[in-house]
Structures are given as C-alpha cells and as structure tokens.
Amino acid sequence: MIGRLRGTLAEKQPPHLILDVNGLGYELEVPMTTLYRLPSVGEPLTLHTHLVVREDAQLLYGFAGKRERDFFRELIRLNGVGPKLALALMSSLEVDELIRCVQSQDTSALTKVPGVGKKTAERLLVELKNRFKAWETSPAMFALVPNQPDGPAPVNTAENDAVSALISLGYKPQEASKAISAIKEKGLSSEDMIRRALKGMI
C-alpha cells in the first residue's frame, strides 16, 4: 500500500496530477479541495494517498492531509459509494462541511452533488452518523504548501480544463459549460474557475 508520496509537482490537469518522485512520475486523482491547495508546477509537494487495485487498473488517489484521506476511506466503505462518488462529495464540500451535514442530517447540500438523490443522501447521512461520532470539526484544515499561482493560463485552455474537471465529477457537459461560462471575471486559472463554479452549483 502506498500511503504517502513526496516529490515535485510535474503536471496538473484537474482532477489529475503527476508527482515526480526521484524521476518516477505517479499519476494521481485528487478532490478539488486538494487541488485548490496545490503549489506551482515545479514546487515540492507531499500528498497522503490511497491505492485502489482493480482487475484492469491500479488507481492512486491523493489528498492534502491524512484526515482528508481517512475521510475518503470511510466514504468508500459505505454501501454504493465508490471512489468517483467519494471524490465528487469531497470536491463539492470541505470535510468539515460534510461532517456538519452528518451531524445535522442536512441532505440539501448533498443532493446538489452529481449522482446523489434525496434517498441516497438520507441513507449516506444515516450510515455516516454512526461512523463519525468520534470526529470533530476543526477550522484548521490540512497542511500543504501554500498555493503560488503560476500566472493565468490562456483563457480557452483554462476554461476547457475547468469544464473537463466538472464533467469528470459527474456533471453533464451542458451543466459544466454553463457553470464556467457564467463566470465573468477574466484571466482566472482553471482551479479558480472550478472553485467558483462548484460554489455556484452548491
């Protein structure tokens, strides 16, 4: 099991990135909440990881901190929740926000996540309530190298990357394009576009 990787951020193509560890490039998929905390390409980066082994592939998921990684592991233990849905949940809401939804049994935020209807949200919250009684919310999130923007990407490229990232989270192409097109500010990075689009959707 690969539990943590430390190296240099070689590429980022939301929601994927490549981490160069001593010349070996690891491709990881990360939730958007981790993506927002990434340093610039070429900067050092440490990620906590979870490896999923399937018959046709080995998939590596990366997280800003151990607490976030552990939450992901709890989610995929639930009935009907795979890595894709777990990442969609964690991309739309911070871990503390998800825990507060569990504590208050509030389905409204969860039902806005692609693939989560009212009945599914209710079931997830009931199952999670027992699992997370010992968890505490904390304003201090996960330690990671502060984001250092490497300059705005060309608008078309950034927009395309942002739309592709939303589609990978389960949003329909038309929904993704509409959400990105609604952002009026120019010169934003794909990460900033994704963050604003997700806030608007939730």
From Swiss-Prot:
Keywords assigned by UniProt, alphabetized: Cytoplasm, DNA damage, DNA recombination, DNA repair, DNA-binding
One cellular component term from this protein's GO annotations in UniProt: cytoplasm
Region (Domain III), start-end ranges: 154-202
Chain spans, region Domain I: 1-64
CDD domains: UBA_RuvA_C
Sample GO molecular function, one term: four-way junction helicase activity
GO term, biological process aspect, one: DNA repair
Keyword Thylakoid tagged: no
Its biological purpose: The RuvA-RuvB-RuvC complex processes Holliday junction (HJ) DNA during genetic recombination and DNA repair, while the RuvA-RuvB complex plays an important role in the rescue of blocked DNA replication forks via replication fork reversal (RFR). RuvA specifically binds to HJ cruciform DNA, conferring on it an open structure. The RuvB hexamer acts as an ATP-dependent pump, pulling dsDNA into and through the RuvAB complex. HJ branch migration allows RuvC to scan DNA until it finds its consensus sequence, where it cleaves and resolves the cruciform DNA.
Name used for this protein in its record: Holliday junction branch migration complex subunit RuvA
Species this protein is from: Pseudomonas fluorescens (strain Pf0-1)
Gene: ruvA
